[in-house]
């Protein structure tokens, strides 16, 4: 472009009130050319996330976003492109599909803030996944389940069910995290392991609220003390893990699941999962009188909805409520 043409172009921009410094225009042009893959990688790198979460986001992006949308300039993303991508993923893996969409939507929210696009093209209305209708275990059923679990780490069943710790939180509890004056025992949840690639990396807990002390019910505290006193189950020293394999290594979720499934089968509940023990704890705490706020603190949740989500229905509890309602009416069943 010669000087006269350049001046004419600049004058046009001024007349249309669109003029900005050339350097700024060049920077904006370069930014608008950044692709979805480049921007997503930058977005993940800049987020203050736990290592495991970053790895999970990267996996969803690598497997489901980059192959289709990776080469598309962020500035050219449209609702039509997103709808086509969403439909192309199919319905075989709904959870992975939903997570990939949530990553892309979060990335595009930041792109709006960065003024790369005027609005977020991710506008698909997702149906919330159906809540699992699971009946809570009774303490008696819990004893049967625990009785079928490998004795070396049987105490884990009771800890998960009565304290509502996440499995990842439990397997990082060390001797130094156990506060016990002989009467009251608290477990300080401060770290959590996560799989990053082929390695297990210990980092922050799932959320800031997840860092918390959890008071252990006295009967479970007694079990933990007995477990800690058994040198075949727990090593000495402040760094010793509370729950381990027979070789003293960190207990894996797969190994614990295999053992736990035997217990679930024993009571005719093969549908249950490890995480359901956390829900049992929330239900038992609520039945013991915990308020929603107290449940939020105990479970390490940031919203009442999440705390309520973990409470299960109990047929026996429903019968007890019905009896108490009659008592309020002055009638003794």
UniProtKB/Swiss-Prot annotation:
Signal sequence: where? none
What Enzyme Commission number(s) apply to this enzyme?
2.7.7.-, 3.1.-.-
Where along the chain is the active site annotated?
A: 166, 206, 275, 278, 301, 310
Task: Cite the Gene3D superfamilies for this sequence.
Answer: 1.10.150.130, Intergrase catalytic core (1.10.443.10)
| Keywords assigned by UniProt, alphabetized | DNA integration, DNA recombination, DNA-binding, Hydrolase, Transferase, Viral genome integration, Virus entry into host cell
One GO process term, biological-process aspect: symbiont entry into host cell
| Molecular function per GO | DNA binding; hydrolase activity; transferase activity
| UniProt entry tagged with the keyword DNA-binding | yes
Q: Where are the transmembrane segments?
A: none
Describe the location of the Core-binding (CB) domain by residue ranges.
34-112
- Tyr recombinase domain location: 132-323
**Which PANTHER family does the record cross-reference, listed alphabetically?**
PHAGE INTEGRASE-RELATED (PTHR30349), PROPHAGE INTEGRASE INTD-RELATED (PTHR30349:SF64)
UniProt function note: Integrase is necessary for integration of the phage into the host genome by site-specific recombination.
Q: Which family does it belong to?
A: Belongs to the 'phage' integrase family.
> What name does UniProt use for this protein?
Integrase
